[in-house]
Amino acid sequence: MDKRNSHKGAFWATVLSNQQIRTCYYRLNLELEPAATPVFGSMSPGQFAMLDLTQVALPSQDKIPSHLQDTVKRQLILRRPFSFSDMSIENNDLGSIVRLEIMYCVLGPSTVRMTSLSKGDKVNLLGPLGNGFELPEQKDLAILLAGGMGAPPLLHLASVLKTQRPQCRVVVFAGSKNCDHLPFTVRIGNKTGVVLEEFEQLNVECFVTTDDGSAGFKGFVTTRAEEWLKKNIWQPLKTIVYACGPEVMLSATAKLALKYDIDCQVSMERMMACGVGLCQSCAVEHKTRQPEQTEFRLCCQ
């Protein structure tokens, strides 16, 4: 386990806002209790928390998507993992307070319940968990590949890179099945094409791809990223690739980085029961340095 931030704990968070940004995507903003500041204040992009949603009520019947009407009847027992799209530390009368932003997609009984959270509600979370992204100081170009709901931790990473590594150029490639599945505030610009406002606010270069061509480049983020690499001047030793998204995309990203001899970090995501390695349910098979050999490692570690 990464020892850069091995501290974690269970804390209460107060809902500040819960905004729908796309058909099935929401942005949840939380303020943690003061005791969480020493722990979450040093959190790295890419880490996550396990939310306890067992006591959160379902929304009214008319607000539950029709295809989830039966699914939401399942009883919740376990916490659910969520990464963060932003983290900030604010000062108020109580001292330093951590605020977190979670972007989530409504997919099942847990996330359906999350849509009913409103300002002032409280939820319990366990974290921060997992390993965050590393930020090498010698890099002057960071290429971020975000696939679907793999986008939140990369939005957080882009923000941190802009503030902590101002000398590093950040270029983002964000992809999804179609325009409706881009988990961002989307705007069509007259000159700039498809604009993702969250990255625009960070003053970060961003290229959009969709499988069906309904927004931006038609194709995969890895294809668009390779086109960019071929057309621009960059140095392999001073470049790093970060990625989060579907595993097939992460595999393609790793192959792309290997082809161009670029350092690469990928964030793996799995459904899990505990988030701390006890349940062993998030094992991921990966290659070793020995040809034809693989081993399993836990996604949460």
Tell me what each language-model feature is.
Residues 109-271:
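FNR/FR-type flavoprotein reductase catalytic core
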Residues 23-25, 42-45, 95, 135-138, ...:
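Short glycine/proline-enriched turns and hinge-like loops at secondary-structure junctions
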Residues 39-46, 69-80, 96-99, 186-201, ...:
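Glycine-rich, flexible loop segments associated with nucleotide phosphate handling
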Residues 2-119:
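Ferredoxin-reductase
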Residues 153, 247-248, 269-301:
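Local cysteine-cluster metal-coordination motifs and their immediate loop/turn environment
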